[in-house]
């Protein structure tokens, strides 16, 4: 089972935890573990514009686009930035996640924000979520997460508060109708 380019959708049993109602985009999943970014937890009052100012990158032409919030990608390395975007070459540190998505960790992509060189779709996160070997698989057995193939419409264009519900809807379920506790038969 490889969950790269899938969503992990937090089950209701994660209520009152860091991952309550979270949707995680899995960027990498292999025999050594997994890495992903929460796509629906904005950092309070932290926009792309504020990020650029903090990094001393001058704002460019389309400042309206810079009002997008920066996401909290997860509790690990919250001093590091990760940029999910539609495929586009020319950045120093980019990896293809899927045919529709790349992840870049170099600052050169930030200099394109608001210019014609900016990728069509973009989401910036600080921090990430990670699992050691076998940890994610055990969480799936324990009914912590639902999984579905990622959808770039949800990833880049769905309103942030709606992403949890919409990701679960891809499975044909209403997440609000799922019990907080699950059992095993």
UniProtKB/Swiss-Prot annotation:
Cellular component GO terms held in the UniProt record: cytosol
TM regions (residue ranges): none
InterPro entries listed in its UniProt record: AlgH-like
Family (UniProt): Belongs to the UPF0301 (AlgH) family.
Protein name: UPF0301 protein HDEF_0602
Organism encoding this protein: Hamiltonella defensa subsp. Acyrthosiphon pisum (strain 5AT)
């Amino acid at each position: 089972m490889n969950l790269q380019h899938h969503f992990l959708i937090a089950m209701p049993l994660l209520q009152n935890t860091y991952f309550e109602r979270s949707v995680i985009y899995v960027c990498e999943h292999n025999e050594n573990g997994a890495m992903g970014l929460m796509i629906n937890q904005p950092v309070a009052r932290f926009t792309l514009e504020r990020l650029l100012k903090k990094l001393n990158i001058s704002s460019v032409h389309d400042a309206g686009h810079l009002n997008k919030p920066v996401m909290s990608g997860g509790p690990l390395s919250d001093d590091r930035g990760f940029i999910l975007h539609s495929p586009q070459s020319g950045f120093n540190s980019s990896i293809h996640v899927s045919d529709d998505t790349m992840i870049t960790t170099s600052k050169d992509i930030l200099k394109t924000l608001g210019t014609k060189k900016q990728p069509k779709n973009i989401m910036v996160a600080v921090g990430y979520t990670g699992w050691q070997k076998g940890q994610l698989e055990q969480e799936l057995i324990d009914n912590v997460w639902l999984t579905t193939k990622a959808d770039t419409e949800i990833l880049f264009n769905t309103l942030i508060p709606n992403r949890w519900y919409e990701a679960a809807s891809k499975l044909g379920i209403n997440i609000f109708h799922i019990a907080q506790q699950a059992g095993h038969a």
